[in-house]
Amino acid sequence: MSWQQRVDDALTARRVTDTLRRRYVVSQGAGRWLVANGRQYLNFSSNDYLGLSQHPQIIRAWQQAATRFGVGSGGSGHISGYSVAHQALEEELAQWLGYPRALLFISGFAANQAVITALMKKNDRIVADRLSHASLLEAANLSPAQLRRFIHNDTQHLSRLLQSPCVGQQLVVTEGVYSMDGDSAPLAEIQHIARRHHAWLLVDDAHGIGVTGDEGRGTCWQRGVKPELLVVTFGKGFGVSGAAVLCSESVADYLLQFARHLVYSTSMPPAQAQALSASLAVIRSDEGGERREKLAALVQRFRAGVNASRFTLLNAHSAIQPLIVGDNSRALRLAEALRQQGCWATAIRPPTVPVGTARLRLTLTQAHEACDIDRLLEVLHGAGE
């Protein structure tokens, strides 16, 4: 088979199963409204949960820092790219979340890949929730360690997998809030089981940080759990981008030596780090609390109004509200029907989710108003499906 044939066959396979992904060009993609092709839509696809991407205080912080530092960092943090803005943000994050150290990464994908790649060796075992993010599972598959996946949120299955003999170390991997199902992991029980088997716990709280817990400290804080490795990302609740790993002093020093994604990547712009510090200040403030309260009320309003006889609504109380429709083509038709009525929603299909669980992944944000939720419900229940 030629290279071109391989490429063509892969694309054809996606087309015939209605799983071909595409990008949409938008003029505005964050916040309450999405603008595409000159038309304005209510935006139910954004991860900007607290509406901070448009916050004037955060925008101003980025602008001022760009004037001071320029628009790029100029290098890896190991060479010339670790500025006072990066250092300040790391210290603020560590203090906020109660860890000795925080290390910044350019993305959550890079952070997850870096930690697993650097830590896991031959004869080790990774035991991951089967619905863990692609960045975690890909890193686990590529590492020399054995990967075992436990049934989603099934702590008994997790315990059985950890009980089987392992010559090396074991790492349990889960998420705080799951990106496609919107539900939360039983973190306290998972941590208890991990410690009983002398395993470390890695929690990716991309969709919980900033949005849940006291001062927005996330799902782990809310559940009274402190994993050995906590990954937080800044493209959701923070409204910016990037990520950090929270850990001990020794693990941070280890990652600075052996995490190739960190050593060999240009660090985030200092202006971005300063904007993130400004975002953290908003998240921790009374305003941040008010934004979280409003978002929670909107989620409750949506769940109370959904017609359960027409849609399978998962047990999700986060900003992520998936409606399971099953069939790929039906999910695409439903998303298009919503767009025709001015509501922008995204159809999620395999391989992102298991076969037979295609869905509309609706995301609610603090930028929405109650009337927006009511309009979404009206359009959903009137969709010709």
From Swiss-Prot:
Primary enzyme class: transferase
Documented EC number(s): 2.3.1.47
Molecular function GO labels: 8-amino-7-oxononanoate synthase activity; pyridoxal phosphate binding
Cofactor: pyridoxal 5'-phosphate
Binding site for substrate: 21, 133, 352
Family in the record: Belongs to the class-II pyridoxal-phosphate-dependent aminotransferase family. BioF subfamily.
Annotated function: Catalyzes the decarboxylative condensation of pimeloyl-[acyl-carrier protein] and L-alanine to produce 8-amino-7-oxononanoate (AON), [acyl-carrier protein], and carbon dioxide.
Protein's name in the database: 8-amino-7-oxononanoate synthase
Source organism (scientific name): Salmonella heidelberg (strain SL476)
